[in-house]
Regions:
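Conserved AMP-binding/adenylate-forming core of the ANL superfamily
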Residues: 15-59, 66-67, 84-89
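Structural core segment of the AMP-binding/adenylate-forming
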Residues: 3, 43-44, 67, 71-147
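Conserved pre-ATP/AMP-binding loop-to-beta segment of ANL
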Residues: 11-12, 138-158, 162-163, 191-198
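Conserved AMP-binding/adenylation subdomain of ANL enzymes
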Residues: 175-198, 202, 206-246, 260
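Conserved AMP-binding A3 loop
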Residues: 24-28, 152-181
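AMP-binding/adenylate-forming catalytic core of the ANL superfamily
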Residues: 83, 100-102, 237, 247, ...
Length: 514
């Protein structure tokens, strides 16, 4: 169903609650505002199939915009609020956005953007001037537009391995704004979500999972509680305060909550949780096991991408029987392929591809990048996100790492994820990344970049402690040849790491000293 249906049935029910302030937007208000947003687009001659963008923090208006865009039949681009003006300008240009919505919080970036991308008109929230988004929207009729048609998101990757890639998915075949989608059906069948769900969204809404899962809750008629930003202890307090029974997390969230002092963790009642969904990155086995011991068997993991080409799913009981797995296929058929695109034997590592179960479905494309689009497909027409893994005899998928992150040292393929998963379980480590740096003898050397819980611990003693910790668990070829310490790793709030930035720095430094 569409939020407009719930607005008629339960107009006063909270659709959105901002966790910190308690500001609440009812379904009636969400419906009214989204109609006005759609009317505004038409008044600016933005029609079906056009593109609009929003560069916002987790803002009360975020979903009002998203649902307005959805019922106006446009492609809507969520842009990271952490980007610089040139980075935002690139996405606006690449996507062909006709309009940008921002906020006063991002005024310095948006002011610079107005200078370097003057052709894209802006409206801003919390700005009492001629660019006021609230004023422009309030002036519009609150009735539905005459040509309502379902739109869809067009989201950009984090750019962790290069320029951000826009994932453009064709507008839905069914133009009805209230047509059910696959995610909604899966949310009910696999995750048990419903109109009674009180769903926590602790991550930035401009990313695929927070945006799509939250909008799915709105389709079901539940309540979405939005955290302005993630904080481990505040998350626990929010679960208790609002009686949260579902939410979407990433492994980094789990690590940070687990590393809270025991007395802080014990202060909060999280027994209302029935469904803690997680994805975005492989979760270290000890971390997930500890979360299940703490929260109970309520963790549900899936593997999928912004591209929407397929997914897997696993429950906590299944995972305890198959630790480390991301589950069996939920949508699409999983294939593990060699370099020629052929299936490899069961249990053998290879590149993960999804075969569509609906042969009429239109595949995604990387916007304005036909080469990247072609690289994501093999000779069978199956699509891949570039990840490597294996499938066991029962059909359970195990992730190894991204193909592009692989380190080749002395002719041996080394996947950083295995080493990173061990490092983050050390009690003095907050976060870790492993990259390949130049080595005159081996081609590449394994470098671990470690973010300590306390930067005062950084130094030779902690390095020795980490080596001693890793030694029984890693072969010598995988042991980091170099361990460096950093105050903060360049990680997205969704858990994705800008590993390219780290790797490039080591290779650039080597060139300068050559």
């Amino acid at each position: 169903m569409h939020p407009s249906v719930h607005a008629r049935a339960n107009p006063d029910k909270p659709a959105i609650v901002m966790a910190a302030s308690g500001e609440t937007i009812t379904y009636a208000e969400l419906d009214r505002r989204s109609n006005q947003v759609a009317q505004l687009l038409r008044s600016r001659r933005i029609g079906i199939g056009d593109t609009v963008a929003m560069c916002l923090e987790n803002h009360p208006w975020f979903f009002c915009l998203a649902w307005g865009f959805q019922r106006a039949g446009v492609h809507y681009v969520g842009i990271s609020s952490r980007l610089t003006a040139p980075e935002v300008a690139y996405i606006l240009s690449d996507s062909g956005a006709n309009m940008l919505f921002g906020s006063a919080y991002l005024a310095p970036v948006l002011d610079e953007l107005a200078r370097i991308a003057p052709d894209v008109p802006q409206l801003r929230f919390d700005t009492p001037d001629t660019m006021s988004a609230e004023a422009a929207i309030a002036a519009m009729p609150s009735e539905p537009i005459a040509d309502e048609r379902a739109g869809t998101d067009m989201l950009y990757s984090s750019g962790t391995t290069g320029r951000p890639k826009g994932v453009r998915i064709p507008l839905p075949e069914d133009p009805a704004i209230d047509a059910p989608n696959v995610l909604m059906q899966l949310a009910m069948a696999a995750y048990g979500l419903s109109d009674r769900s009180v769903y926590l969204s602790p991550a930035p809404l401009y990313h695929a999972a927070p945006l799509r899962w939250s909008m799915t809750i709105h389709k079901l008629g539940g309540t979405v509680v939005v955290m302005e930003k993630f904080d481990p202890e505040v998350t626990l307090a929010t679960i208790q305060q609002y009686g949260i029974d579902a939410g979407q997390f990433v492994p980094t969230h789990f690590v940070r909550m687990l590393k809270l002092p025991a007395e802080a963790r014990a202060k909060y009642d999280v027994s209302t949780l029935k469904c803690a969904i997680h994805a975005a990155a492989p979760c270290p086995v000890p971390v997930k096991r500890a979360m299940i011991e703490w929260w109970g068997p309520v963790l549900f993991e899936y593997y999928a991408g912004t591209e929407g080409n397929g997914s897997t799913f696993i429950t906590s009981p299944e995972w305890l029987a198959k630790p480390g797995s991301v589950g069996r296929a939920l949508s699409g058929v999983v294939h593990i392929c060699d370099e020629n695109g052929d299936d490899v034997p069961t249990g053998t590592e290879g590149q993960i591809f999804f075969e569509p179960t609906d042969p009429t479905a239109k595949p995604f494309e990387y916007h304005n990048d036909p080469v990247k689009t072609a690289e994501s497909r093999n000779k069978h027409g199956w699509t891949s996100l570039g990840d490597v893994g294996r499938v066991d005899e029962d059909g359970y998928l195990f992730l190894t790492d991204r193909k592009s992150f692989m380190i080749i040292s002395g002719g041996v393929n080394i996947y950083p994820q295995e080493i990173e998963n061990l490092l983050v379980t050390h009690p003095k480590v907050a976060d870790a990344a492993v990259v390949g740096g130049p080595d005159p003898d081996m081609g590449e050397r394994v470098i671990a970049v470690v973010q300590p819980l306390d930067m005062a611990d950084a130094g030779p003693e902690l390095e020795a402690e980490l080596r001693e910790y890793l030694a029984p668990q890693l072969s010598r070829i995988k042991m980091p040849k170099q361990i460096d310490f950093i105050e903060q790793l360049p990680r997205e709030a969704t858990g994705k790491l800008y590993k390219r930035h780290l790797r490039d720095a080591y290779w650039a430094a080597a060139k300068e000293t050559a």
